[in-house]
Structure formats: structure tokens, C-alpha cells
Amino acid sequence: NKLELLKWIREEKKCEWDVGTINAAVGQGNLEMVKYCVANECPINWSACGCAASGGRLEILKYLREEAKAPWGSWTATRAASNGHLHILEYLVERKFDEYEEDACENAAKNGHLDCLKYLHETAKAPWDYWCVQEAHKNKHTKCVQYLLDNDCPLPDGWRYEHGELHVLVESESESSSESEPESSSDYSLF
């Protein structure tokens, strides 16, 4: 039993612990171990809620927020979106979470989680930026790209969306995207 081992290490061997201890318990999905850490004043910060969100561990996230009063931050939504945990995003909205950053939408788009992307944009009112389109396109998540385009997500410099077609700047190996300017229509590829 991992909880018994943790108790032995702390109580018998008097080993130190830090936020990594509770994060490891959260990552394993071991609620009893998390409760032990909280009851015995293990250091905790915003990363514990992020770890719970990353693994889709709603019961642990609820315990951390509602019982342990653990802090959370934008990383909580970002990790949930990155791994497609819509139920975590729904919980965040229910709890009036308001610390969304562009990374949440970007990670949902990057990993093809259209349901999370839609929920973040339409319900959570999370911000987004051109990275969403760029990452969804790069990873060939066409449904996410189309949703972003249909909802006026900003485009990367040099990209265009006209008459239902996405024109993507093809970057040469010797130029960075911030320096390259299209010289002709051959500098674009169509999505």
C-alpha cells in the first residue's frame, strides 16, 4: 500500500516532503494519499490542481478546492484542455473559474479536442490567439481549424482565409515566420 509507505517514510523516518509529494499522490489518483498529505500539512500550491486536471481526476480536484482550499491558476484549465477533459472544464465553469489564458484554447486545438475548444470559447469565454489556428493546422486537426476559422480566431502573420479557403504561408528553412513575407501565390499552401 503506497499510503502505508508514505506514512512510514514521514512518521518513522521523518523524511522531508514538498509540493512534489502531494503532486505525486494526485498524479497516481490516490485520494487517500492526497487526504493524508493535506491532513499532515504537506506543502501545496497551484500545481496540485493542475495535476488533477491533467489526469481528469475530478474527485481529487474537488477535494483539493473544496476541502483543502488549494489554489489554482490558468494551468488547471490548460492541462484539462490539453488532455481532453471536458468534465474538468465544466467543473471550472461551475465553480466560476476565471483564470483562463490563451494556452487553454491553444492546447485543445493542438491536440484535436474540438469539444473542449468549443466549450472554452462558447461557455467559458476563454481567450484565444493565432497559435490556436497554427497548432491545429500543424497537427492536422481539420475540424478544429474549421471551427476556429468559422469563429474568427486571429490568423498567424501572412496567413489568409478567403472564400472558404485557408492560405498558409509556407516557411523556407532559412527564414523564420516573423521575417518571411510571401512573394507570390506559390508561397502559400491551401488547407
Tell where the protein language model's regions lie, with residue ranges.
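Leucine-rich solenoid repeat scaffolds
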Residues: 130-173
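Short intrinsically disordered, low-complexity coil segments enriched in acidic
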Residues: 1-9
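Ankyrin-repeat boundary/"N-cap" motif
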Residues: 16-24, 43-51, 71-79, 99-107, ...
